[in-house]
Amino acid sequence: LNEENTLTKSREESKYFQLLNGEWNFRFYNTIIDVEDGFYAADYEINGNYDKIKVPMNWQMALDKGYDTPNYTNSDYPYPCDPPYVPDDNPCGIYIRDFDIDENDLSRDLFLNFEGVDSCFYLWINGKFVGYSQVSHMTSEFNINDFVQAGSNRLAMLVLKWCDGSYLEDQDMWRMSGIFRDVYILKRSRRGRIRDFYVTTELKKKYTKCIMSVDLDLVGDREVSYRLVSPHGESIDSGESVNGKIKIKFDNPILWSDEDPLLYDLILDVSDEVVLVKVGIKDLVISKSVLYLNGQKIKIKGVNRHDSHPLYGHATPIEHVLEDLYIFKRHNVNAVRTSHYPNDPRFLEMCDQLGFLVIDESDLEAHGFSTSIDGFFFERWSLLANDPSWKEAYIDRARRLFERDKNHVSVIFWSLGNESGCGDNHQAMYDFIKSRNKNVIVHYENANYRYSELAGKFLGNCSDVESWMYPSIEKCKEILSSKKRKNKPLYLCEYCHAMGNGPGDLGDYWELIDSDDKFCGGCIWEYTDHSVAIPDGNGKYKYTYGGDFGDMPNAGNFCVDGLVYPDRTPHTGFEEAKYVY
């Protein structure tokens, strides 16, 4: 374990990283009521009722097995809207696999990580209950030292299709379940390690001087040795932390931008562990309704991107994610909104290194309340947002987003979610993020002045930008001239819907965007057609819509509304976007 290995190797190459992806034993149940007792026991015999399933993979994508049904719905909940309850006939899957632990590793702290499981899960190891977690698109981590032994160990999970958290995950997408991101064990030092860290930078004297601060959360009584290396390989500073803090002052910092994504290497050494942090230095501010990056006015030329693959569902291979970003670069896209949930953690590493502006979105949408219950439109839409019993669930989603992604320079806006009305719980999310860093920019579209008028009270305190969806060009002009905007820049989090032969009006929008500094740009809805590919009987695949699997409710062909086909072949509209951007 040394600095050289840390600088050159991926996580998969570390001996302290144990990947558990691969074939797992799996059994599907149409209802949790039918789940047999004792499946989690250490000596449970896996019988012929179990199949093999690939992890990561949504169980609905095992089309030949008939586990459940792929279901595409936009805003309608796929079950009766009665929070916090979900149907008793709740489909679920049992996952079982054995894994080995080396005896030497028992002297380290062992952390089992799940980067994405939809919608919730219960976890056992060697017959003992370890814990429970939900929030589908966020990492869940468990210390498993009290549950494992040297040699073979049995891991068992019960994953439910729906839970109370599903009321906050009503995104426009194919509804799919199971383990859809990586599973692995981290083997951490007990004698001394970095539990967490937060790197911030402050620029002074017209960007000629920089103060880099690192707040460390340490395990053990050791301080941290550090070394800072410039993007060009020059050693800037080295030393040791004091009381868990590092402060580095240096001249002529090299700034990060989407066009010139230069990153410093910060090496943190606790003797038993070495951590490499890729640090970007930027100055992002809003001044007099204008968005500035490093003192220059910037425009967001963005797209909304879902995790979607025609063969793998939400279990999008990381190579496929990288290819998406290359496609963006080839089409002059400089910004990505992670609609409508956090992406794979490595996505932001790629955005840091390739140069993208990221609107990083919480895993939160409650769109179905706008249509599924009685009452005034905005009041019912904001039902959970104004319910104190849901406050901690909202804050939890903001906290887990921010703490996971806080060290990524590519993030320009922290988004509180999508289409969930607006209420006190959104304000609590905003307040939490600002308590961690008062200088970051927080985004939420349902806090714009149109919704304040509908709600009969001002909602704009939980968003630093005036964000709208699909306003006409004339409406944009009205917004830009309105005092109701409260000196916030106008940003279109969704515009120019790309369904069919769209988007056809990009040029007209960008004439206005380019003519007004208060208009900072927008993100086209959306990047890719969502579809499940099925064999056509002739050795090829055909793409499906909502309802093609008998799924109800469904939103039909509204899932194919992207700039590219499911296989990423560009539509003609993407060529127009490339030209305009």
Segments the model singles out, each with a brief description of its role:
Residues 10, 25-31, 50, 61-66, ...:
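Accessory beta-strand-rich segments of carbohydrate-active enzymes
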Residues 146-152, 215-287:
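Extended acidic/polar, glycine-enriched regions
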Residues 124-130, 229-231, 271-272, 294:
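Short strand-turn-strand beta-turns centered on an Asx-Gly dipeptide
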Residues 190-220, 570-581:
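Surface beta-strand/loop "capping" patches
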Residues 180-198, 282-297:
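Low-complexity, Pro/Ser/Thr- and charge-rich linker/hinge segments at domain boundaries
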Residues 19, 92-98, 109-111, 139, ...:
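Intrinsic-disorder/low-complexity, polar/charged segments enriched in Ser/Thr/Lys/Arg/Asp/Glu/Gln
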Residues 1-10, 53-55, 62-65, 73, ...:
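Extended substrate-binding grooves/exosites of carbohydrate-active enzymes
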Residues 1-19, 25, 32-35:
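N-terminal pre-domain segments of enzymes
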